[in-house]
Each structure stands twice: as C-alpha cells, then as structure tokens.
Amino acid sequence: MSVQAGTSPVLSLAGLNKSYGALQATRDVALQVAAGEIHALIGPNGAGKTTLVRQIYGSEAPDSGSIRLRGEEIGHLSVPQRVRQGIGRSFQISNVLADFTVIENAVIAEAARTGGAFRFLRPAFSDPALVEGAMTILSRVGIEGRADTPVSDLAHGERRLLELALALAGDPALLLLDEPMAGAGPEETQHMIGIIDRLRGDVGILLIEHDMDAVFRLADRVTVLVEGAVIASGTPDEIAGNTAVRNAYLGSDDDAAA
C-alpha cells in the first residue's frame, strides 16, 4: 500500500486481527496514513471501523499484527503512553466535561497529554505554558472567543469543535477522528469540514465518517472496510469508481434504479 510521494507514514498497520469468539472484527488489516494527509476509513455499520480505531488507540489489543507510529512499534504501549507518543482522538459521543468552562477543559487536556499530573485546576492555571497551549488548541478550531463559556452553554456544533480541540492537545502526529460530524446540522457540518481541512499538512488524520460528502471533500485517500477486511484503498476518485465498493457500501447502480 503506497503513501503520498515524498512523505513517510505516520501510522502503519500490518496484519491486524481481532476476534470476539466466532466474530472476526478485523481481518488482516493493513493501512498507512502519511504525515499530514487526511485518510478516510469508511464502511457499513458493523464493518469493524471503531474496533480498528480502538486497537490503534490502545483501548483494545489486537490478537495479532503490528501498529507503528512514526516507524516505532506501539502495540505494547498503554493508552496514556500512546497519547504521549503522539496520538490524539475524538470520539463518536462527545466526552467533554460539561460542568467546566471551555478553557478549563483545554487546560486539563493539555496537562494530561503532556504528562502533567494536576489534582486541581488551580495548579494547572499557574503554569503559563499549559494555559498558552490550551488557548492555542482552541484557536486552531476557532473557539478561543468562547474560552470562559461553560460547556453546558455551548451549542452542539461548538461542543464537537471543543472535542476536536482537546484531541489536538499536546500537538499530536496522528489524529483519530470518529464521526466528528455526528449529530451536526448542515451549517455545523460545513464549518467542521472547513476546520478539518485547515489541519491538512499539520497532522496525519484517520477520519471515520458516514457523511460521504464530507469524506470525498476532505480525504486525500480512502480505505474501505467491509466485515473487518479492507476491500479497497485509493484516491476518492478511485474509490468512487470501484464497483466492489459501490456494491458493498455506496450502493450499486441496480440498487439505485430499484
């Protein structure tokens, strides 16, 4: 599997297998994400996408296979260790702290990603580097003006942007985005697409998304997962023209005519 010319893979997966009893969730998965590219992972519900992301992030262990971040094997590392090595993740369901302000969430994320241990927020706010880092990640997604706003007062789209900002804490090399447009309205979706597009070149992104318009607007490359196995990987144009992909996921011409 090739990566973009002149770039090295920030993430390399080889031979990843994961079974739950008789159910094989991932089957010999191989995938590469180049530094700075947006690589979309698509497939029908139950295809194994989230299971694969959990293996990359470290919340589940594969039965076999290799996971390399910037050339280094990380399969033996814990989630906190992988985060410190350069992995950020946003989740399908928002996991921000609703009882805190936007900046408090960002400071906590910066402290956690940089290995800091703060029992209370006051010591964290006494560290200028943490506060500066927190404001930087908020500005990267355009919500620095909401820094002092309680999270409970944010609109849904703003919460999703905050979640993206928190995933950027610690300046990761790889960002795992699990349906960042979930639950968003048309305007919020377009805004999120623009924010993610501006991250291109700064961080490698593995994007899981059911919104095909967003996928084909954002992705440099697309990998299609069906029943835990990769059935195709290529440019958006190559994937859109792939008959097997259309039949398995996007819908065949016969289905469209039915």
Where in the sequence are the language-model features?
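Glycine-rich phosphate-binding loops of nucleotide-dependent enzymes
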Residues: 2-258
